[in-house]
Amino acid sequence: MLSLATLDMLLSISEGELIEEMVVGLLAAPQLAIFFEKFPRIKRALMKDIPGWKQNLQQRIREASVPPGLANEFSLYQQSLLEDSPQFYAHLPDIVAQLQDLHSPFATQAKTLVQTADLAKNPPGGDSLQTLFLQRWRVSLILQTITIHHQLLEQEREQLLAELQRRLALSGALEPILTTNDNAAGRLWDMSQGHLQRGDYQLLLQYGDFLQQQPELIRLAEQLGRSRSAKAQPAPDARYEPYTVMVRQPDSVPEEVSGIHQSNDILRLLPTELVMLGMSELEFEFYRRLLERRLLTYRLQGDNWQEKTQQRPVSLKQNDEQPRGPFIVCVDTSGSMGGFNEQCAKAFCLALLRIALADNRRCYIMLFATEIIHYELSADNGIEQAIRFLNQHFRGGTDLAACLANTLNKMEDREWYDADAVIISDFIAQRLPEELVRKIKIQQQAHQHRFHAVAMSAYGKPGIMRIFDHIWRFDTSLKSRLIRRWKR
């Protein structure tokens, strides 16, 4: 079967010019021109796809077949080219008849040429009629082939235009939320290839609007994103600078039972002491021991971490830009993180995705409760994954240790060796195993990994939060929310 590309080659038709003409006409479409004027960043991202479009169209032409009628006509034309003048004139009536049988557009013109020449009365004296006939026939074949090209390219144009309009609508809606520079616009354009309709990404728009109403959350994400932007280089002249360390002090914070002692703490009485209140003979003895602080009670003990400022020698020569690694974001989905906390946590992840797109970084989300759920928001299908993430509800338990263990395993992967871990939680959880804390310290010291805590509550346990390099506080209590609103 004759292919369209072969016919182009034999008739010396330039398919590249036809494709170029189609692409130029497509980009000049009024609906696209208006959109490009409104979103120039997305236009620049789209222009990078044009070479790929042309290659796909060329491949489509190579795979297309010529209709049987045109293929038979072209075969007849090739046979006629090989004949000398006597043979050609002898077969000319048969050629005209075959053209009529094939319903060729050239059939009428061929019949007219033969009738005008009147070969029966005026035998040809040269090859002028043969040359004219073959030239007109070739022109007709070229026109038929170009018509097939136009039909094929028009189908591709309609499909491509519909796809572009869908992707442009998606990118245009998300552009104010997720893009801050050309790099982010390009990555957003690449991520818009999924089969998403307008109703699918409405949730993204809702959280984008919520994020705009929380400017403090945006600033917090930007500060976290820039926190690894520079590193200090030593210089010969040393000087001192203050720095803050966390000092551990034993305290009676209710973290764990460490024994029994004598006190007057009614809330932590042993059951045997309460028995005395039920016996009239021992009731006065109970009150006497209460006044003397000699009642047997549970001893609850934990760690109280306080900030202490010290001096250390430091020398700085310059700040050299560091490559910014990907984000591994762990989100607490326990019941205490529901409601406004859930909205803030999801919006903060959206803000981190915006930074990741702008800085060409990756953004990996892990939800920790009774099981670990993974999403990579910066992947090619990142928009679909972001929508699935935003549809999650925070109603589980808290398993911070399992999440941190998964984060450490992820950091062992070569693709994530320079990642920053971001933990979003209220940090009202059980104490971390000492072995896990030790592994985290190794990652921090040996591999320069940074662990960030985004605390959504003022009541997080100090014993948990001491492992983090940075603690970013965003108190979601009603009082703090009212204060932030009043300051705007």
From Swiss-Prot:
General function of this protein: Component of the RavA-ViaA chaperone complex, which may act on the membrane to optimize the function of some of the respiratory chains. ViaA stimulates the ATPase activity of RavA.
GO CC terms: cytosol
Transmembrane portions of the chain: none
Protein's cellular compartments: Cytoplasm
UniProt KW keywords: Chaperone, Cytoplasm
Name of the protein: Regulatory protein ViaA
Subunit structure: Homodimer. Interacts with RavA.
InterPro entries the UniProt entry points to: Uncharacterised_CoxE, Uncharacterised_ViaA, VWF_A, vWFA_dom_sf
Pfam families reported in the protein's UniProt record: VWA_CoxE
Family: Belongs to the ViaA family.
Highest taxon of source: Bacteria
